[in-house]
Amino acid sequence: MDENISKLRDMVAGSDNIVFFGGAGVSTESGIPDFRSVDGLYNQKWKYPPETILSHSFFERYPEEYYRFHREKLVIDGVKPNRAHLRLAELEREGKLKAVITQNIDGLHQAAGSRNVLELHGSILRAYCSRCHKPYDAGVINKGTGVPQCSCGGVIRPDIVLYEEALDDDVVSRAVHYIRNADVLIIGGTSLNVYPAAGLINYYRGNKLVLVNLSETQCDSYADLVIHEKIGEVFSRI
């Protein structure tokens, strides 16, 4: 494993066009549960399965139940960026990292100092009215009770992509641009099972595809470098 980390270190040292594509595993070391891990949200007992609650149709039909789940399970106070977030921000400041493309909704990349962050699934730190689209601070949702209402009478919702909803076209287009033009593409902390987001990596045309994940993924067989370690540990060594 030390040899593989050394190879990754050399790749990073020799490139100024790195793109990072990350998932829930990037934030687990900050105390945010991974949806699909053994201890993740999808394995915790609830009245409805989490994937049902986090769907557009459920939100429309049972907003009270959705917000109860949202405040109890998605809003986690006191979380801070970990070693992976901080090192990625450093690489951007050094002019090496061009973009962070994340499936996470926690805002920890920005908290670490990263500036060019493409949030495929939105952010729990933003909110807007589902009727008039007026923007709101997420505190209206996260620190409130019941179903938050806009002055127009519409329901205020978090600026996240729920199941059954499409990804933002502009964010996807920018992500494709960065992946397609990357010299080094590092994929970290994701099982690559969430589509359409996971399909974006197919746009990579280079020969330095790196996978950093605790467990195996469907892309391990054609990656140029695979490291099965905690992502914070790996990034602290590059």
Descriptions of predicted regions:
Residues M1-I238:
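Conserved catalytic core of sirtuin-type NAD+-dependent deacylases
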